[in-house]
């Protein structure tokens, strides 16, 4: 590892600053116990940046991210800023420009249901009795969200609107390579999601994915149409390892996978570019309704930090130790409100303390 690893810390809005404080506890242990040399610099983003500087992504924040090796992101948004035009609101005016600026073409969303938390899943107990571990890999910078032309118009027949789904072969190839590489260190299965029976873009998607798969003979490739995939995830989620998806399909199916785990407060995410520069954030939102109550689940933020350690710093053993510390905390029965019975639960800061203690003690 380089002499000093620079992390831009962007707590943001809502519960973002609260759960980020718990991630700092882990970062302190990484410096003290594992001798990592970290340079942590905090910047405003989202609603708080609008309040202070009039813009969701200030130039100072963008420059700070450019001078960093990775971004640890909290959350942005809230009703307070709903009066703004959509394009100026925290979510639209901060995250999307960051993804575009750093060419973060891949989004990794783990959806893991631990056996000791299977009661949280809305699925039948016989379906989730062994838990599941799915990694959704979503192409993030192409497809219908960014394709042109798009627009909304009126003519003599009425009002109409249109969007364009477009993918280049190189966009599909690079996301497919990432999926197969990651599958090689997991259970060696990739299921590619498309709609190749009706969409030309999906026909190309399937062709390129098949082509890339030839370079990974040890990884089993399968294909599902998006509608069937959504059904199969409900019917038997344990059959899946990695789901490889286009932008819009990944947007939909990763939320479905998150929901069947029972708590989005447990789920991290990573958005990466070709240089493994990444933006790491909880999969959930800013949850302004519980802001300041010390009841938010910090696990997604801590696991997002673990993903940063794994993918941008390439320190898998240390990332494994963080993941194990979370595992031990849950195994011992510690629960925040969102994953509790509603009566017996601990506070945000207490969960952070417990996970940090397990990491520090090296259990």
UniProtKB/Swiss-Prot annotation:
A single Gene Ontology CC term: cytosol
Site (Important for catalysis) residue list: 145, 195
Keywords in alphabetical order: Amino-acid biosynthesis, Branched-chain amino acid biosynthesis, Cytoplasm, Leucine biosynthesis, Magnesium, Manganese, Metal-binding, NAD, Oxidoreductase, Plasmid
Compartments, record wording: Cytoplasm
Pathway: Amino-acid biosynthesis; L-leucine biosynthesis; L-leucine from 3-methyl-2-oxobutanoate: step 3/4
GO terms for biological process, alphabetical: L-leucine biosynthetic process
Cofactor info, note text: Binds 1 Mg(2+) or Mn(2+) ion per subunit.
Matches recorded under InterPro entries: IsoCit/isopropylmalate_DH_CS (IPR019818), IsoPropMal-DH-like_dom (IPR024084), Isopropylmalate_DH (IPR004429)
SMART domains: Iso_dh (SM01329)
Coiled coil: none
Reaction equations catalysed: (2R,3S)-3-isopropylmalate + NAD(+) = 4-methyl-2-oxopentanoate + CO2 + NADH
GO molecular function terms attached to this record: 3-isopropylmalate dehydrogenase activity; magnesium ion binding; NAD binding
E.C. numbers: 1.1.1.85
Binding site for NAD(+): 78-91, 285-297
Keyword Glycoprotein: no
Residues binding Mg(2+), per UniProt: 227, 251, 255
Binding, substrate: 99, 109, 138, 227
Cofactors that this protein relies on: Mg(2+); Mn(2+)
Subunit structure: Homodimer.
Annotated function: Catalyzes the oxidation of 3-carboxy-2-hydroxy-4-methylpentanoate (3-isopropylmalate) to 3-carboxy-4-methyl-2-oxopentanoate. The product decarboxylates to 4-methyl-2 oxopentanoate.
Family: Belongs to the isocitrate and isopropylmalate dehydrogenases family. LeuB type 1 subfamily.
Designated name of the protein: 3-isopropylmalate dehydrogenase
Lineage, opening ranks: Bacteria, Pseudomonadati, Pseudomonadota, Gammaproteobacteria, Enterobacterales
């Amino acid at each position: 590892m380089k002499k000093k690893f620079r992390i831009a810390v962007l707590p943001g809005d809502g519960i973002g600053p609260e759960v980020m404080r718990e991630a700092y506890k882990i970062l302190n242990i990484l410096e003290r116990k594992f001798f990592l040399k970290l340079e942590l610099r905090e910047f405003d983003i989202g609603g708080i940046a609008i309040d202070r500087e009039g813009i969701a992504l200030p130039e100072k924040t963008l420059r700070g991210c450019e001078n960093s090796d990775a971004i640890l992101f909290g959350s942005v948004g809230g009703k307070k800023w709903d009066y703004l035009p959509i394009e100026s609101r925290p979510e639209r005016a901060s995250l999307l420009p960051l993804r575009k600026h750093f060419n973060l073409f891949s989004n990794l969303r783990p959806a893991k249901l631990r056996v000791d938390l299977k009661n949280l899943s809305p699925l039948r107990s016989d379906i989730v009795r062994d838990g599941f571990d799915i990694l959704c890999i979503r192409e993030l910078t192409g497809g219908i969200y960014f394709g042109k032309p798009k627009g909304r118009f009126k003519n003599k027949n009425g009002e109409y609107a249109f969007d364009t789904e477009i993918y280049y072969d190189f966009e599909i190839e690079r996301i497919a390579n990432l999926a197969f590489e990651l599958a090689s260190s997991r259970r060696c299965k990739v299921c590619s999601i498309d709609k190749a029976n009706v969409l030309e873009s999906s026909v190309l998607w399937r062709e390129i994915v098949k082509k890339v798969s030839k370079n990974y003979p040890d990884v089993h490739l399968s294909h599902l149409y998006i509608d069937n995939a959504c059904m199969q995830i409900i019917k038997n989620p344990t059959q899946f390892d990695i789901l490889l998806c286009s932008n819009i399909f990944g947007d939909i199916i990763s939320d479905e996978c998150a929901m069947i785990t029972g708590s989005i407060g447990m789920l991290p995410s990573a958005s990466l570019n070709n240089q493994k520069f990444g933006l790491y954030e909880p999969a959930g939102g800013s949850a302004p309704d519980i802001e300041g109550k010390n009841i938010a689940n910090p696990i997604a933020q801590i696991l997002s930090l673990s993903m940063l350690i794994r993918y941008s710093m390439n320190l898998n053993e240390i990332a494994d130790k963080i993941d194990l510390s979370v595992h031990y905390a849950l195994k011992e029965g510690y629960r925040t409100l969102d994953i509790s019975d509603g009566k017996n639960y601990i506070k945000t800061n207490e969960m952070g303390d417990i996970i940090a203690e397990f990491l520090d003690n090296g259990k």
